[in-house]
UniProtKB/Swiss-Prot annotation:
Keyword entries, A-Z: Disulfide bond, Growth factor, Pyrrolidone carboxylic acid, Secreted, Signal, Toxin
Lineage, highest ranks first: Eukaryota, Metazoa, Chordata, Craniata, Vertebrata
Disulfide-linked positions: C38-C80, C69-C115, C73-C117
GO molecular function: chemoattractant activity; growth factor activity; toxin activity; vascular endothelial growth factor receptor binding
Protein name, entry field: Snake venom vascular endothelial growth factor toxin VR-1
Length: 144
């Protein structure tokens, strides 16, 4: 075990740490700022979350990589929002557990093509997140 850990440590010293920096090095501000900006990024999405009506079959892979908007805006009142979208055709394998059959199939997934920082709240809505009422009316469940 000690030999393995030593080999890993030597490898990291030669190649650098997985994050792209050598241990002890500080990532430059501009690099951090640019990488955190609102932009399209490859994101893994579950096929069943994107196509909830398809629960009777099994998909391989169970998730796919698509471009989605993500990142930080310079103002907390703004959020990273898609301003351009298109449909991507992605080939997957669909397996039917009842018939033990499988087939290759093309499914459609929404991809973001452009992003912008936009206000979190629309005009006419009260600004800010809705706060839960303290001591207010609580939802009643049938078994309470």
């Amino acid at each position: 075990m000690a030999a393995y850990l030593l080999a890993v440590a030597i490898l990291f010293c030669i190649q650098g740490w997985p994050s792209g920096t050598v241990q002890g090095q500080v990532r430059p501000f501009l690099d951090v700022y640019e990488r955190s900006a609102c932009q399209t990024r490859e994101t893994l999405v579950s096929i069943l979350q994107e196509h909830p009506d398809e629960i009777s079959d099994i998909f391989r892979p169970s998730c796919v990589a698509v471009l989605r908007c993500s990142g930080c805006c310079t103002d907390e009142s703004m959020k990273c929002t898609p301003v351009g979208k298109h449909t991507a055709d992605i080939q997957i394998m669909r397996m039917n557990p009842r018939t033990h059959s499988s087939k290759m199939e093309v499914m459609k997934f929404m991809e973001h093509t452009a992003c912008e920082c936009r206000p979190r709240w629309k005009q006419g809505e009260p600004e800010g997140p809705k706060e839960p009422r303290r001591g207010g009316v609580r939802a009643k469940f049938p078994f309470d």
